[in-house]
């Protein structure tokens, strides 16, 4: 963890410290110097933490051990890695403790500079920006003694010199973990400003270490195989240098620091702004006017860069910039060096080794130079030895830095004085120019000097030959004015130059690279410092030129306010300078060090050409600056091919930045600007050479070591600055800037912001497939984080990531699971007798083994209903109606009219949609009991076309699944399957979502109206059936389609007039219809489509003819539909009817007529779960009904077909259960066709009792039609549809399990709801005979599916006045009950009891209703399903939470509804609300652009995909994407609800008395009160006596007791 100093304040918490720190930063106050006690490792020794440790009541003992371990690890500082003395030799990868941002936020982050006092201002990025925008900004005042630690100090305190960016590791704003590697989303420039990548760069994250870690995690030397791997480091001077480091968890963390032109340009502007400000007193520079002219050979400069002249600049003597008025009108380049750019020549960085190969002792050069300089008129000529010329490929371009003072004192001769080889960097220091007053006086001379500079820049390829004479007359007028401002120079300048020349030795490393001992050796430093003191004036200026400009061929001299124009100096002068510089820069650098030892910034400027080592120095910044030795430093080293590129205005930007950022860091004497200049120079030099930057390089590695030259150049500079004292200041700056940036986002350019956003959105964390964390691995992650910090994202193996939690909380999974669970699978459902329904449309024949619906529903539930996939549904005779609501299709038992809440059906069932999706053709095929057929034949006309349309898709797709899946109501005879088919068809025809609403009609009414089912049947229209057919045909495979199929188009009575072939059905239907005709509305008929008729297997003659062909296919398709719908229904909790007729009973058929009219069609649509099935009229719901049932957990019994035409059936309040009873939890409504499901519950209550006996056989047939469970639902729907009018007695259960039903099965896709049901959803009456048969199926359906939809079952999607439907709700059917719970209260009982007596009128036609599994038809309507719940249901909407059909969970765990419940309790789906399935998120798990892992390893999403597929962020903090040091993830939010941390009281979460420590450990404070409380507890709980309560883990303690023991301890009443 990064070692950052922290003010230790026992009285303040870390949070308060952070606030104080931020406030002080805002006030531009300097933080107090770091003290020993402020170290992170000492933080935990503070009394308040110690006290907490003693008094806390840990929930888990492991927390304590982990905490202790963590504390111990903190005490370990990576001294070896950061010890400068070992950097050149240390090979073991550095291991560092990364201080998480959270922890950092809780602790005061003080400047890491040890000797810094709070009296000094803190320079941050905001300050820099401010300076940049306000040239007149005053320079912060600093005291002489306020300077950053020297390199030597850093050696002594390596901990304090850690990279500033350590604290950002683990912060999701800055990067993400990938395969045990921290991947940065951007980089830090030399100003330590964070920059997001503008373009997502190809990040080649090293992967090798992850493999080694996995193979031998305990192997300390796991890194050895990585030595030599270019992804992890590089070799320099036979030393392996790491580009990053490994943290305690062996995660690889690269260095994010880069040198950028952009940052340099910023420094330039800052420099210009600062020019008017004087450099603070520099203890060694006593002469204000002294200007030192230092000519550096590029070679020597490069080599010195290896040695890091910047280090010299950062030497203890560095002056700190103070606010001083310019002396003598010195507008002098505020930066010690006036930047003269060589337009034609590009500065190139030499390889430090090459550069150092030949070095001529600077002493000689300096001597010559000093001599020349001493001659005011004659430029100092330094003839480099033969070695003077760079052996390396150093460009011949000379870089001349002229300080204002230097220019003042320079004569043209002096300008010539430096005879440096081809490339020369000329730094003119005040001291050097002090004696050149005469030159300054001569404007022409000044011009000449300028010309020299310009010429040198132009003729970099030319070596400056010895020429002591340089014409300064060519210097630009600007320079003249500047010189004038400077004033005359004294001879002291010459003196200083001479003194500089006195240096006798050049220190070279093994590579012949110049070693600047001034920084490292006290003796040398002393010598140089003394010389500098004499030679350099306090007013040294950092170079104003920017690296960019250098790279730009130094096209323009950058002289801030004093615009010095570069004039072509005489070639001779250039030659002289070139010759002088061609001498090894090392020598010159040495001189420079001697000259400006304290004036390191000048030397830095001189070294503007930073060799690659400059980055080293930055690395060193963590510990030391680049080793003076050319030896590579251990820190990361950037191999800067890009560094080799021309430096661009490195100095300027650096200088400016340094001035602002370094003041707290710069040694008191040296100005910040000078330091920055030095750093810049080194950075340039680093360019010439490969840059070693431990951390910097790591950062680059993340990006890729190969960076543009600009970046390289810039990076070295930054590194130097950071490596020198500037690093610590930079850290402060970064911190402040980020902190402020949080407040002032404008700090980041909009471009950066865009980049950040782009990155955040586009950056994908590369994770192995295992990146999706599993629950098990979540635990691992949690533990892992406990070891580290809960606050820091733990680098996870790909496996870990995969194992970690899914995108959303478990909730998204729950949705999908609910979908799958809710959707009954019918594939295993088998009916002993296979009914082969003639399929006009290609519909799968549903073979109905006489299987009890329950068994079928179970399997159906497991099977996702796939409307498209049509499979034969075989109902085993053993199929049990008892089905879990979700499994309803198979298990649903139509004990009483069981509504199978069909999730998808409820949501999706709309008469229109269903008809569209489910082809009514099949519905027309629906076989109605002859009675119903007769009655419905008049009113209920099943449009063959609709049926046909409905049949093909629904039947094909759904019938088979329904037949397979349809458990077939218990005791379904092989004949019953046929009947079931008819029922299903009726249900679909009659019931739509609206019909389902009819279903809501009280089943009591249905019972009362059961006498009317015949009329209803007669009236049954397949309008809904048509719609269902249409829907089914259009979308036979989708749950919605199934639902739509389940619900019938409310076909006009004429259309819905389906005659049940079976005489029994006809007889019963006739009776019922006779009463039902009262409610003639086809819609009602459809809604009321009585499953009774369906049960009777009677096929409407008209419909049969048309429908029969269709019905048979429909039965198959319907079964298929049921499967599909069930599948969809699983997705949609809607019409899942627990084969509990009681809920269906809730549907009141009294209002059936109204509902039938209003609701029959609309209801079906609106209330997919409410498919209302009129027992008689809709008795025959062909495959559509079955399919609906399949789609809906609740059998199509709702008789989605509830034929609105049967509105007259009001007497028979055929509570058409919209197979889609949205109110019923879609999840519960597993039967895709909620309508059928609803109806069944209704009918099931009464007819179940009546027809329970017959239902045993009919149920299976119903399932045959319905996709297993829907058959059950259908009967209940029938009862719902018809209960109001003729509430058929159990007698009506005598649904003829006649093959007509099977024929109907062929039609199941177009279940025809008898008009009765549609007419009066409240009255939904199931013909006793039909229902009797459906009763068992209904029971099974109900068992399998909750029938909350039953009330809504009145499938009259169009008829939204569901209110009437609720009236029609059968008491047995309780649609509002959660679809899962949807139980047909009385209907279930009724259904369970073969006797329909409870609701005699409600005749559950087991065949038809079971066939109603066609509610699957409504499956397609799952989206449309409008959970239309009765008033009771409205109270159960909470049960729908988590049902994917009704909404979804956001990443933050918030449940978002996909619609709303209207006043009529109908579910109104909001088409605009869409969400992505979890599978859409799985590939993103582990990508920290999209989320993060919390302290328990759970994946937390930042946003979600909206309906347009766009990623929408919900984390406001993340939206800004601006790093905030004090920003900590709200990991604790996920702990809400965890009883280990608190408890709920009055629906409000209360935390235990405690808090999270910096590591995310939960600390429960124990006060005296708690101790007393514990004492009281011991009294209450004698078993606790004798225990050390303070150390007791309650959970652990309780775990040793059994339930009986707990009773003994806590009492029999307390089961806890």
From Swiss-Prot:
Record carries keyword NADP: no
Keywords annotated in UniProt: Cytadherence, Repeat
UniProt cross-references to InterPro entries, sorted A to Z: EAGR_box, EAGR_sf
Annotated region (Disordered), positions in chain: 1-41, 878-909, 931-975, 1004-1083, 1100-1132, 1159-1433
Composition skew (Low complexity), residue ranges: 938-952, 1309-1323, 1392-1406
GO biological process, one term: adhesion of symbiont to microvasculature
Role of this protein: Could be an accessory structural component in cytadherence.
NCBIfam families hit by this protein: EAGR_box
Protein name: Protein P200
